[in-house]
């Protein structure tokens, strides 16, 4: 596969397609945009001229799966906290 060039060029050229990919997984445009932006922000300091499109698609997919997992864990923790704080019914 051909390298995608520098981060700015790659983002302009492939950002919309990467957001669509993320949106299909997350079912939220806002979250998809956040995931793609975060990916590029994290990649910029260690960008390599060898970065290609399949790498970016795989990275976005992995970020989305991590996002879903983290949201699931967060929801579970909130449920536990709510159960611990909720007043218990008194039995007479």
Show where each model-derived region lies.
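Solvent-exposed, flexible loop/coil residues
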Residues: 30, 81-82
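Arg/Lys-rich amphipathic alpha helix in sigma70-family domain 2
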Residues: 51-53, 58-80, 87-89
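Amphipathic alpha-helical segment used for protein-protein interaction
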Residues: 2, 13, 83-92
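A short, charge-rich alpha-helical start-of-domain segment used by transcription regulators
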Residues: 1-20, 30-33, 44, 48-53
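Short amphipathic alpha-helical interface segments enriched in basic and hydrophobic/aromatic residues
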Residues: 12, 19-23, 27, 40-48, ...
């Amino acid at each position: 596969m051909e390298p995608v060039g520098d981060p700015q060029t790659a983002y302009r050229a492939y950002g919309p397609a990467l957001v669509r990919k993320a949106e299909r997984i997350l079912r939220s445009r806002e979250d998809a945009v956040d995931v793609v932006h975060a990916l590029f922000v994290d990649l910029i300091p260690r960008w390599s001229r060898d970065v290609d499109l399949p790498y970016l698609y795989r990275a976005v997919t992995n970020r989305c799966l991590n996002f879903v997992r983290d949201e699931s864990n967060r929801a579970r923790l909130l449920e536990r906290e709510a159960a611990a704080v909720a007043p218990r019914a008194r039995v007479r």
